[in-house]
């Protein structure tokens, strides 16, 4: 090896040429990366290295109670972190501190498990001490069955430089214990308990003598314990038993020396505190107080007056808390004494634990150097967060300030992170020793007050009593509680090298719910874990540390030279730098500062490993680090018992020595698509169908490194055993016609049955040959259309029939009956009505004629006064003529009860006519001349209401009655009798009949008269008299008939119509009221939410496009927070355009015409092969009127086979919407993306400079719409004020309103549809149609961040490809915008969908009849089908009839009956104009009210111009309500059906056949996660680069004028096109991980200390020495940082990454090194490193097969499933010979079982 820079010791030497950068970690860690990694390590019970000094684990009480992968219990811990701290401490002779932080209040303690994982033996007394101490510190809460209440608990382990433990101690921090929440004032909610020790005291484990002495009662009798009412431990715990725990507790107390007298004093004090708690109520009774104090004083050894008289209630409360804390300090002191005693016995050899552990020989030198490793448990997430953030991000203190002072470039921390750190520190300032804050001063005041109270009570206690021992532990020092034997946490962290072990909790669910889960790791909430990651700023943490500050070792220059001189390092800075170059450490692995040398962990351990290879006599000593008894200790040359010495393969040493060395590679979350191939050669997908892709694994395998089974909503694929696609996305492949049969839903089956039931009589051959409908699905759609049109026609006919004819059927002569009041209204010259003897006559054509043969002229003056009158008294028939058989003389006549007002109109005929010359003189004039002539003008019957008849008969003396519904008025008859006194023949009528009238005036006498007539029938004379009298009454006294129009038969229809009219009017009125929104326009404050302005472009012209883009650019909204996203739906030349629409868009935006980015594959909404589409992405900045806004243009260009077609790439507006929605969905879920989406992400994230996940709103604007400047801000402000708003729209007006007649008739419709319909719906928060031309949707909920419009459910239903029925066609092909609103309402019924009139835009309306006809056909049909869908939704707001469901029904019904409405209006016009029927007053009033209220709306809004538009609209009403609906209904099936999928039968099942279509194979669109893709291509923006992405405000990361489009300006390395000549990226150096057999000096050593505590590995009771690990698998590294398969140097051609970032840094714990081969165990971990491109060898495959076969149920599993499980275990896709070998070996293993 001639080039020293290619040293075998440096991983950098294996990176191919090219720039190496600065050594910073290139991988950008994001929340998604961490979330995915942590989910995987949670499932596999593994830790995750965030950086070299930080590890994360996920634990619950359930996982902590299970046996881990290495056989230990207590939860997952990272043993390698402890090993790293141990190595640094002993090798560097520096103190270390391991912080066990908790990110969630529910995480279990890992203190004991972590201690047991350290690479040293620990005394059993340490674990017993923890068992004894923990009940004092922990209590049960609803969120954690064992919640620690201390600020921090530390275990300090003192080791010598050989790594042996020499001392151990336990201490609380000066923050003490939270006695308030743990004892004094526990929450009063169920589930909370006080400290466990009190319940142990009260259990039956106490002896009867103790209970009698202490006077213990049930827990409910103690105020301190009874607050929550919870006295038992959580029942979901498998070991929830206070009695058993109390027994273990008492045993632990004995082990640490608390027994006998000290135990009695101890429990007396506990009981005294418990009882004293009953005196802390301010309202306690005096007698109770005295009794309790008397009892307690005896237990505590003091006078009762001290507690009762000298102490207030507050003093006693302070005393209880302070004494308890002092008691805990005393227990800890006793524990430390016990630990020290055992350590002394071990050192003296006086104690051996009978081989239960390996004995660790200790040094006999008294003055040997020692260092301390402190393990600090900080259970409070707030305190832990403050300490951690300050240590990582605060550059003014700690190691960060030292590096800055030494000249190391430390990037400034983001302001949002600093703010969060400062807020966290301020919250716990007292615990950090910061005394300048109000909280600190308050804490100090409380401590001083506590000290005074404790001193007062303590001095009054017995001199030799236990209380004085507790309160005055050091004689002469007074009260020193909180300082004596406590840890100074800030000072400890400042003086030690800090390592972080962070515990996360997977869910916010209660611990009780975990017990019911199907598996230990079923509990998972990505939101919960993500919140913890973001709260602690772990992505920024990882990026900051790994890129710049991940130095774990630092030396003085002289110290560095002395340490590594044996490896060739020369004196001085120049010598060091030269040596670093020889090692290949020129990329930031080691940095030489002004005075110190800083090393990353990998470089440091590489150097230390090389030292281990050197002979003993060549090693320099550093102080006393190399003790004389090193070989005796069994450690390696460099003193390492954890890393065995390495075998040198030749005689050379130094940089040219050849060592069998391996490399560690991590794939983390990377897919196989990037791992197994050149990770830099990004795919450039041409618009053609490809079988493979550069940089991607061959798609024939079909899983893209993600497995055969993917996300069902994001590109799921399924394959059979031969690798052929069999999934549900599309059954058609390019292998001819295939038939697919699938069952139909019941609704569809019923509908098909109905269609055939109505259209069976139409033969299909007729449709096929005459109608030219060759396809069955087209014929079926025609039949469906016919049935729908029939139903629509039937409904319209029923409506017209109901309104017009139904009432007449029920009441035939309804319009032939008139009351006298109605007759009185007809008094015009051409409307001359009169009533005569119960009949109504219209003599309008008669009265002007000269009909008198006397001297009376027929003039207006004479005739018009008679109009509308009752003329009974003017036309009196002679009695002999009308009453034959009654012997009435010709000279007799009845006198009139009334005086004639107009004498000239008197038509007396017969004998009493005084003028002999007139024809009236004739006795038969009335019957022969008058009656025949007047019948010509008969118009109807005169009707009287029964109430009128009764009232006038009873009250007014009118002698009339009702007989057979006819009215007879005999008033003149009785008047004549009265005047003649019954003489002169005035009694000519039957007396019995007359008596009935006298007795019942105004009544119905039908029964009485019939009775008389029946009786008279037996007597001929009587019968003759009665019949003649009845005949006379009918002829002479007939007055009319009863008003039958008042009967139920005639009124029921009117009442029904009136009821519906009232409901409609109520809706109209409510709509009117909702539209009355007065007041000045509110001016919301400027908003700062990120918004994507989506503009789908199809065939619009340049003027429309420019208006739309300019209006969006000029919006009064932060330019950096809006993104214009134009999606061109195909390369299409619109009518009137001279170039394709995409070219117009790019020309407007100023994109360089030379730019031609690659076409990238994505899945479109289409059928068959049309699902495969290609698109191009452009980005840059657009400037208009000083506004510079970023834009993104996506052009759908189609496949190569489409280029000869007229519309390549065109898939419809819905596909354009889905393209962006799907992209944002995958951004939200961090899901694998297709190539087009990856490029979009890159352009937005890295070129434009905004993380796509920051966008919160999607603003949809059509390409022919211009938006007013303030509209977007108003929409966003409305959403910001109401977090329930999921969609919102504004008013859309016309910008070409005066262009043509066809635009004019639309102006008023647009206005009123918004201000009446949408304003009304907005009241309910349920706007049923958010127009696609001007609508904004919220992407995710404001509270929990759940996706809304980008949710899986909405996208899945909106992106349906099989649009094969008439209903689906109308929903998805015509009214996609309305259907999108329907889907949003369906999936999120409790969200609001609003309309605000203040937001305003203008759009271009159709200017020609043909375009208007086409538009309204789509609108009307889609409205009808969408409203039908809405009717089926269950969750619709409202109550009673006034619900949205009712309104939707009204709208649906109104749409369907539009033609009926027009016909009825025409009928009304005819009635009014012709006068052929009754005047429709109510209908006219309703119409006037409807349009009057509409007019009132724009009048009140001062929109005067709409008066004219309203008139034009009314004139065009027949077009809107008749022509357009009829045309639309009949053209429901007018679609372009295509020929890809043909429905050939729907008789219970549906069959689909592919015709001339190659089909869509999902493998043609590979999917890959952004983080993996970005890492593989060395791209920035791996989801963690912007601190504003998490909590806090957005920090602008760029200046707008500095942003360059990747295509419109300088060509950059696109993520998709890649760089043809790029080599593998630089790989940060890793540990060489040397291995070999042990040196002769390596011997098995035995220790008298053991980790056999409750958390130790039960399988490793006889644990081997760390020096005996040389027998490990030859393919395993033996670094403390990893234990994973490695490979030889010859295979190092793939991309490697820092394992701490990508999840590969997964070492087995120290407890897991039992020697032997652990290949199977390692391969089972998701985070074990792969063997690179070489793949797993035969042995690994065989081992994986055997493991899988042992785990599965052979009776149910298939070979395919076994193969998948084996590949999953191997984390590799086996192909070719490897696959064949696997299949053969599976068969072999099955045969041998």
From Swiss-Prot:
Cytochrome b5 heme-binding domain sequence ranges: 815-877
GO BP annotations, alphabetical order: chitin biosynthetic process; fungal-type cell wall organization
Protein name, as recorded: Chitin synthase 5
PANTHER family attached to this UniProt entry: CHITIN SYNTHASE (PTHR22914:SF13)
UniProt-annotated stretches for the region Disordered: 1-28
Glycosylation positions in this chain: 70, 164, 638, 664, 669, 897, 1019, 1023, 1421, 1534, 1705
DEK-C domain: residues covered: 1735-1791
Enzyme Commission number(s) of this protein: 2.4.1.16
GO cellular component terms, semicolon-separated: cell septum; myosin complex; plasma membrane
Major location (coarse): membrane
Pfam families tied to this protein: Chitin_synth_2, Cyt-b5, DEK_C
Disruption phenotype: Reduces the germination rate to about half and leads to hypersensitivity to hyperosmotic stress. Exhibits a significant reduced pathogenicity in Arabidopsis and cotton plants.
Keywords tagged on the record: Cell membrane, Glycoprotein, Glycosyltransferase, Membrane, Motor protein, Myosin, Transferase, Transmembrane, Transmembrane helix, Virulence
Gene from which this protein is expressed: CHS5
Organism (species): Verticillium dahliae (strain VdLs.17 / ATCC MYA-4575 / FGSC 10137)
Family according to the record: Belongs to the chitin synthase family. Class V subfamily.
Reactions catalysed according to its record: [(1->4)-N-acetyl-beta-D-glucosaminyl](n) + UDP-N-acetyl-alpha-D-glucosamine = [(1->4)-N-acetyl-beta-D-glucosaminyl](n+1) + UDP + H(+)
InterPro entries: Chitin_synth (IPR004835), Cyt_B5-like_heme/steroid-bd (IPR001199), Cyt_B5-like_heme/steroid_sf (IPR036400), DEK_C (IPR014876), Kinesin_motor_dom_sf (IPR036961), Myosin_head_motor_dom-like (IPR001609), Nucleotide-diphossugar_trans (IPR029044), P-loop_NTPase (IPR027417)
GO MF term (any one): chitin synthase activity
EC class: transferase
Function: Polymerizes chitin, a structural polymer of the cell wall and septum, by transferring the sugar moiety of UDP-GlcNAc to the non-reducing end of the growing chitin polymer. Regulates Germination and Tolerance to Hyperosmotic Stress. Plays a key role in pathogenicity. Likely contributes to post-penetration virulence.
Protein location: Cell membrane
Positions of transmembrane segments: 750-770, 786-806, 1056-1076, 1452-1472, 1479-1499, 1507-1527
Highest taxon listed in the record's lineage: Eukaryota
Membrane-topology annotation of the record: Multi-pass membrane protein
